[in-house]
From Swiss-Prot:
Its main location: membrane. Belongs to the complex I 23 kDa subunit family. This is NADH-quinone oxidoreductase subunit I. Binds 2 [4Fe-4S] clusters per subunit. Keywords: 4Fe-4S, Cell membrane, Iron, Iron-sulfur, Membrane, Metal-binding, NAD, Quinone, Repeat, Translocase, Ubiquinone.
Length: 160
């Protein structure tokens, strides 16, 4: 009797599994064939960091160091000096991407939208040294992604 009950239960469970399989076989697929297909990104997606420039080519960063102070991972290091006109500009702006937790606090703290997290999430490297971003690398990212970053910032709603 117990053997017959176990066989019956196994058969019923097998049929249930087939029914579930058939149900999902004819539904639209939810997976993407990455990297050929890419899904949509939220305007607030936080990817690779970039430093932006004004349209006249001047760096936006005013060396207020708010991003360095607010970074919970202490991944940002900034050194600055005063210029002849009295304004401050960075001489060193480094981000250790191995420490960064992509929280976006640096972007939120920046009063001039100088540091942003762009739409690029495909930046795999072979060595840890390549994940140490200096000012030149960050400015280059800003130049490459400026159009996409500006569009995303326009779509985004301010918290303030």
């Amino acid at each position: 009797m117990l053997k017959k009950l176990a066989w019956y239960w196994s058969f019923v469970e097998l049929i249930k599994g087939f029914i579930i399989t058939l149900r999902y076989a004819f539904k639209p697929k939810v997976t993407l064939k990455y990297p050929m297909e890419k899904g949509p990104l939220s305007p607030r997606f936080r990817g690779e960091h970039a430093l932006r420039r004004y349209s006249n080519g001047e760096e936006r960063c005013i060396a207020c160091k708010l991003c360095e102070v607010i970074c919970p991972a202490q991944a940002i290091v900034i050194e600055a000096e005063e210029r002849e006109d009295g304004s401050r500009r960075t001489t060193r702006y480094d981000i250790d991407m191995t420490k960064c937790i992509y929280c976006g606090l640096c972007q939120e703290a920046c009063p001039v939208d100088a540091i942003v997290e762009g739409p690029n999430f495909e930046f795999a490297t072979e060595t840890r040294e390549e994940l140490m971003y200096n000012k030149e690398k960050l400015l280059r990212n800003g130049e490459i992604w400026e159009e996409a970053i500006a569009l995303r910032l326009k779509k985004d709603v301010s918290y303030h």
